[in-house]
Protein backbone atom coordinates (compact mmCIF):
# COMPACT_ATOMS: atom_id res chain seq x y z
CA UNK A 1 0.00 0.00 0.00
CA UNK A 2 1.44 3.40 -0.97
CA UNK A 3 0.94 6.11 1.66
CA UNK A 4 0.09 9.65 0.61
CA UNK A 5 2.44 12.52 1.37
CA UNK A 6 -0.12 13.95 3.83
CA UNK A 7 -0.26 10.66 5.75
CA UNK A 8 3.52 10.40 5.88
CA UNK A 9 3.88 13.98 7.10
CA UNK A 10 1.36 13.31 9.83
CA UNK A 11 3.29 10.25 10.94
CA UNK A 12 6.52 12.21 11.01
CA UNK A 13 4.97 14.93 13.16
CA UNK A 14 3.47 12.77 15.88
CA UNK A 15 6.07 10.12 16.68
CA UNK A 16 6.46 9.43 20.40
CA UNK A 17 9.10 7.38 22.20
CA UNK A 18 10.10 6.53 25.79
CA UNK A 19 13.75 6.88 26.73
CA UNK A 20 15.82 6.97 29.87
CA UNK A 21 17.61 10.30 30.01
CA UNK A 22 20.04 12.43 31.94
CA UNK A 23 19.35 16.11 32.49
CA UNK A 24 22.33 18.36 31.87
CA UNK A 25 21.75 21.87 33.25
CA UNK A 26 22.88 24.95 31.40
CA UNK A 27 24.20 27.97 33.25
CA UNK A 28 24.94 31.32 31.74
CA UNK A 29 23.77 34.92 31.35
CA UNK A 30 20.14 35.62 30.68
CA UNK A 31 19.14 36.01 27.06
CA UNK A 32 17.90 39.46 26.17
CA UNK A 33 14.76 38.79 24.11
CA UNK A 34 13.46 42.31 23.47
CA UNK A 35 9.75 41.43 23.67
CA UNK A 36 10.26 40.04 27.18
CA UNK A 37 12.62 42.60 28.65
CA UNK A 38 10.03 43.85 31.13
CA UNK A 39 9.76 40.41 32.72
CA UNK A 40 13.40 39.35 32.80
CA UNK A 41 15.17 39.53 36.13
CA UNK A 42 18.90 40.37 36.22
CA UNK A 43 21.36 37.76 37.39
CA UNK A 44 22.20 38.42 41.03
CA UNK A 45 23.16 36.70 44.28
CA UNK A 46 24.69 33.81 42.38
CA UNK A 47 21.46 32.82 40.64
CA UNK A 48 21.35 32.19 36.93
CA UNK A 49 18.28 31.38 34.85
CA UNK A 50 19.10 27.76 34.03
CA UNK A 51 18.33 25.78 30.91
CA UNK A 52 18.55 22.02 31.07
CA UNK A 53 19.45 20.03 27.99
CA UNK A 54 18.25 16.46 27.49
CA UNK A 55 20.62 13.69 26.43
CA UNK A 56 20.01 9.95 26.13
CA UNK A 57 21.81 8.09 28.91
CA UNK A 58 20.81 4.83 30.58
CA UNK A 59 22.26 6.01 33.90
CA UNK A 60 19.87 8.93 34.24
CA UNK A 61 16.53 9.40 36.01
CA UNK A 62 13.43 7.85 34.50
CA UNK A 63 10.96 10.17 32.77
CA UNK A 64 8.96 9.90 29.58
CA UNK A 65 10.91 11.56 26.78
CA UNK A 66 9.29 12.75 23.57
CA UNK A 67 11.82 14.11 21.08
CA UNK A 68 9.97 16.25 18.54
CA UNK A 69 13.20 17.81 17.32
CA UNK A 70 14.17 14.59 15.53
CA UNK A 71 11.23 12.25 14.75
CA UNK A 72 13.59 9.70 13.20
CA UNK A 73 11.13 8.30 10.66
CA UNK A 74 12.63 6.59 7.64
CA UNK A 75 10.37 7.33 4.71
CA UNK A 76 10.00 5.15 1.59
CA UNK A 77 12.10 6.10 -1.43
CA UNK A 78 10.50 8.94 -3.37
CA UNK A 79 8.20 9.89 -0.47
CA UNK A 80 10.55 12.04 1.62
CA UNK A 81 8.72 14.95 3.30
CA UNK A 82 10.26 18.38 3.57
CA UNK A 83 12.26 18.55 6.77
CA UNK A 84 11.97 21.45 9.17
CA UNK A 85 12.31 22.37 12.83
CA UNK A 86 9.64 21.68 15.44
CA UNK A 87 9.22 24.56 17.86
CA UNK A 88 7.77 24.85 21.35
CA UNK A 89 4.51 26.23 20.00
CA UNK A 90 3.94 22.85 18.35
CA UNK A 91 5.17 20.85 21.33
CA UNK A 92 2.67 22.55 23.63
CA UNK A 93 -0.27 21.06 21.73
CA UNK A 94 1.19 17.55 21.57
CA UNK A 95 0.25 16.53 25.11
CA UNK A 96 -3.37 16.90 26.28
CA UNK A 97 -2.35 16.67 29.94
CA UNK A 98 -0.93 20.23 29.81
CA UNK A 99 -3.74 21.78 27.74
CA UNK A 100 -4.84 24.19 30.51
CA UNK A 101 -1.38 25.71 30.96
CA UNK A 102 -0.83 25.74 27.19
CA UNK A 103 -4.03 27.76 26.84
CA UNK A 104 -2.80 30.31 29.38
CA UNK A 105 0.54 30.55 27.63
CA UNK A 106 -0.98 31.02 24.18
CA UNK A 107 -2.70 34.17 25.45
CA UNK A 108 0.74 35.78 25.92
CA UNK A 109 1.43 36.96 22.38
CA UNK A 110 4.93 38.26 23.12
CA UNK A 111 6.03 35.03 24.76
CA UNK A 112 4.53 33.01 21.91
CA UNK A 113 6.82 34.91 19.53
CA UNK A 114 9.78 33.65 21.52
CA UNK A 115 8.49 30.07 21.62
CA UNK A 116 8.20 30.17 17.83
CA UNK A 117 11.71 31.61 17.39
CA UNK A 118 14.37 29.16 16.30
CA UNK A 119 17.15 31.43 17.57
CA UNK A 120 15.93 31.39 21.19
CA UNK A 121 16.08 28.52 23.67
CA UNK A 122 13.40 28.23 26.35
CA UNK A 123 12.36 25.69 28.95
CA UNK A 124 8.65 25.60 29.82
CA UNK A 125 7.93 24.08 33.23
CA UNK A 126 4.32 23.13 32.51
CA UNK A 127 2.06 22.06 35.39
CA UNK A 128 -0.26 19.23 34.38
CA UNK A 129 -4.00 19.77 34.17
CA UNK A 130 -4.34 17.84 37.42
CA UNK A 131 -1.82 20.14 39.11
CA UNK A 132 -3.69 23.25 37.99
CA UNK A 133 -7.04 21.77 39.04
CA UNK A 134 -5.70 20.98 42.51
CA UNK A 135 -4.91 24.63 43.30
CA UNK A 136 -7.13 26.22 45.95
CA UNK A 137 -7.67 29.17 43.58
CA UNK A 138 -7.60 29.29 39.80
CA UNK A 139 -4.43 30.85 38.33
CA UNK A 140 -6.42 33.92 37.22
CA UNK A 141 -7.57 34.48 40.83
CA UNK A 142 -4.12 35.02 42.41
CA UNK A 143 -1.82 36.63 43.48
CA UNK A 144 -4.01 39.73 42.92
CA UNK A 145 -7.41 39.31 44.59
CA UNK A 146 -10.31 39.98 42.24
CA UNK A 147 -13.17 39.66 44.73
CA UNK A 148 -15.22 42.84 45.08
CA UNK A 149 -13.64 44.50 42.05
CA UNK A 150 -15.51 46.00 39.10
CA UNK A 151 -15.84 43.87 35.98
CA UNK A 152 -13.25 46.02 34.22
CA UNK A 153 -10.80 45.68 37.10
CA UNK A 154 -11.49 41.96 37.39
CA UNK A 155 -10.55 41.45 33.74
CA UNK A 156 -7.36 43.47 34.09
CA UNK A 157 -6.31 41.72 37.30
CA UNK A 158 -7.16 38.29 35.90
CA UNK A 159 -4.92 38.95 32.89
CA UNK A 160 -2.11 40.10 35.19
CA UNK A 161 -2.51 36.98 37.32
CA UNK A 162 -2.36 34.68 34.29
CA UNK A 163 0.75 36.45 32.99
CA UNK A 164 2.36 36.06 36.41
CA UNK A 165 1.46 32.37 36.59
CA UNK A 166 2.98 31.72 33.17
CA UNK A 167 6.14 33.74 33.89
CA UNK A 168 6.66 31.68 37.05
CA UNK A 169 6.92 28.56 34.88
CA UNK A 170 9.23 29.70 32.04
CA UNK A 171 13.04 29.76 32.05
CA UNK A 172 15.24 31.31 29.36
CA UNK A 173 19.00 31.15 28.91
CA UNK A 174 21.81 30.49 26.46
CA UNK A 175 22.84 26.89 25.77
CA UNK A 176 26.01 26.53 27.86
CA UNK A 177 26.08 22.90 28.96
CA UNK A 178 27.57 21.87 32.31
CA UNK A 179 27.53 18.61 34.20
CA UNK A 180 24.60 17.76 36.45
CA UNK A 181 26.52 16.92 39.60
CA UNK A 182 25.03 19.34 42.15
CA UNK A 183 21.71 20.98 42.94
CA UNK A 184 21.18 23.66 40.31
CA UNK A 185 19.57 26.99 41.11
CA UNK A 186 17.76 29.10 38.55
CA UNK A 187 15.30 31.95 38.12
CA UNK A 188 12.14 31.94 36.05
CA UNK A 189 11.03 34.91 33.94
CA UNK A 190 9.22 36.33 36.97
CA UNK A 191 12.33 36.07 39.13
CA UNK A 192 11.06 33.05 41.07
CA UNK A 193 14.00 31.14 42.54
CA UNK A 194 13.93 27.38 41.88
CA UNK A 195 16.20 24.41 42.49
CA UNK A 196 16.54 21.39 40.20
CA UNK A 197 17.92 18.11 41.52
CA UNK A 198 17.51 14.34 41.33
CA UNK A 199 16.24 12.12 44.12
CA UNK A 200 15.22 8.45 44.06
CA UNK A 201 15.84 8.40 40.32
CA UNK A 202 13.43 11.30 39.73
CA UNK A 203 13.95 14.87 38.54
CA UNK A 204 12.54 17.39 41.02
CA UNK A 205 11.95 21.13 40.76
CA UNK A 206 11.63 22.97 44.08
CA UNK A 207 10.25 26.45 44.78
CA UNK A 208 9.18 28.12 48.02
CA UNK A 209 5.65 26.77 47.53
CA UNK A 210 6.18 23.23 46.30
CA UNK A 211 8.44 20.42 45.15
CA UNK A 212 7.33 19.06 41.79
CA UNK A 213 8.29 15.86 40.01
CA UNK A 214 9.05 16.05 36.29
CA UNK A 215 6.94 13.32 34.67
CA UNK A 216 7.74 13.95 31.01
CA UNK A 217 10.13 15.97 28.87
CA UNK A 218 9.11 17.07 25.38
CA UNK A 219 12.18 18.14 23.43
CA UNK A 220 11.89 20.56 20.49
CA UNK A 221 14.40 22.37 18.30
CA UNK A 222 14.23 25.57 20.35
CA UNK A 223 13.73 24.26 23.86
CA UNK A 224 11.98 21.74 26.05
CA UNK A 225 8.71 21.31 27.90
CA UNK A 226 8.90 19.73 31.34
CA UNK A 227 5.55 18.32 32.43
CA UNK A 228 5.26 18.67 36.21
CA UNK A 229 2.88 17.20 38.78
CA UNK A 230 2.72 20.38 40.89
CA UNK A 231 2.50 24.11 40.25
CA UNK A 232 5.58 26.09 41.30
CA UNK A 233 3.38 28.79 42.85
CA UNK A 234 0.29 28.42 45.02
CA UNK A 235 -2.20 30.94 46.41
CA UNK A 236 -1.84 32.32 49.91
CA UNK A 237 -5.07 31.64 51.78
CA UNK A 238 -6.14 33.62 54.83
From Swiss-Prot:
Alphabetically ordered keywords of this record: Signal, Vacuole
SMART domains given in the database record: FAS1 (SM00554)
Domain FAS1: 85-232
Domain of life: Eukaryota
InterPro entries: FAS1_dom_sf, FAS1_domain, Mug57-like
Location in the cell: Vacuole
Gene Ontology cellular-component annotations: vacuole
Name of the molecule in the record: FAS1 domain-containing protein YALI0D26906g
Cleavable signal peptide: 1-17
Amino acid sequence: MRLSNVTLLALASFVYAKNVITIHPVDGPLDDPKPLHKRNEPVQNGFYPGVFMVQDDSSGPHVDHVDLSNPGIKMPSGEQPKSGPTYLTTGLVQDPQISIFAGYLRDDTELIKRLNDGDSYTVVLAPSNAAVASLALKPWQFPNAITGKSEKDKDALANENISSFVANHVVVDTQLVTTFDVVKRARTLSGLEIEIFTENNKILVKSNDSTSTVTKIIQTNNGAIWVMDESLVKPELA
